[in-house]
């Protein structure tokens, strides 16, 4: 491995971890409501709990900022890896792995972060639009029917990973980005362990895209 490769991988790891650790849900809950989202509802500092705890007025800013944060990282390192190594997808996948770690264990907030579904969702689109499209479509259908955010995100992202492996089998898509994204999805699912228990017991709270339910949600 050349020195430029080492620098590139190190930069992707460090920058993605630090930038992804900046959590819009925590920042906005403190700035607007003078509360830490981690003390509200389920305690998860993410879009779902923010919307349940404070309503939808600012929740969509959390959603868009989380996506924008990932998009900037994945675009930057996709372009850098393509320029120096000719590997767009590898750059995106490496960035995604450390973005997941930064989102889940942020150094800025005592290593208490979120579950990372928006990191996975954004990465899926940058890895291959077909993976992003399938994952987003499945998530949307499940949200509009069963209204279980945790189930929708896990199923959607698992299918996105499946699409990447299918592309690996049928096209020149690399095995490494497919494997790294699959690790991200597995990590995200493990972060949903409490939700999985509630799903099995039939006690998982519903999530409504529209409307402002403010109960103590489960995500």
Short names for language-model regions:
Residues 26-59, 113, 197-219:
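Cytosolic, membrane-interface loops and tails of multi-pass inner-membrane proteins
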Residues 51-56, 77-80, 98, 116-146, ...:
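Interfacial segments of multi-pass membrane proteins
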Residues 16-20, 99-103, 140-143, 164, ...:
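Alpha-helical transmembrane segments of multi-pass membrane proteins
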Residues 7-32:
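N-terminal signal-anchor transmembrane alpha helix
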Residues 52-78, 95:
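Multi-pass membrane catalytic core of lipid/isoprenoid biosynthesis enzymes
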Residues 36-46, 107-121, 148-156:
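Short, non-helical or kinked segments that cap or interrupt transmembrane helices
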Residues 1-11, 74-94, 125-131, 166-180:
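Helix-coil boundary and interhelical linker segments in multi-pass alpha-helical membrane proteins
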Residues 133-135, 149-157, 172-182:
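Loop-to-transmembrane alpha-helix initiation sites
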């Amino acid at each position: 491995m050349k020195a430029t490769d080492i620098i590139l991988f190190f930069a992707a790891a460090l920058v993605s971890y630090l930038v992804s650790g900046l959590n819009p849900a925590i920042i906005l809950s403190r700035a607007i409501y003078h509360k830490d989202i981690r003390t509200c509802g389920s305690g998860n500092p993410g879009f779902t709990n923010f919307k349940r705890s404070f309503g939808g007025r600012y929740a969509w800013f959390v959603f868009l900022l989380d996506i924008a944060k990932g998009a900037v990282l994945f675009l930057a390192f996709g372009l850098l890896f393509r320029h120096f190594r000719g590997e767009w997808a590898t750059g995106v996948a490496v960035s995604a792995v450390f973005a997941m770690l930064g989102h889940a264990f942020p150094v800025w907030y005592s290593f208490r972060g979120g579950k990372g579904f928006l990191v996975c969702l954004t990465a899926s689109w940058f890895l291959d639009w077909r993976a992003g499209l399938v994952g987003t479509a499945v998530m949307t259908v499940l949200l509009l029917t069963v209204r279980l955010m945790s189930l929708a995100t896990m199923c959607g992202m698992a299918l996105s990973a499946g699409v990447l492996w299918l592309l690996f089998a049928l096209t020149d898509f690399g095995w490494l980005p497919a494997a790294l994204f699959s690790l991200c999805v597995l990590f995200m699912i493990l972060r949903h362990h409490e939700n999985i228990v509630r799903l099995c017991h039939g006690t998982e709270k519903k999530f409504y895209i529209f409307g402002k339910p403010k109960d103590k949600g489960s995500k």
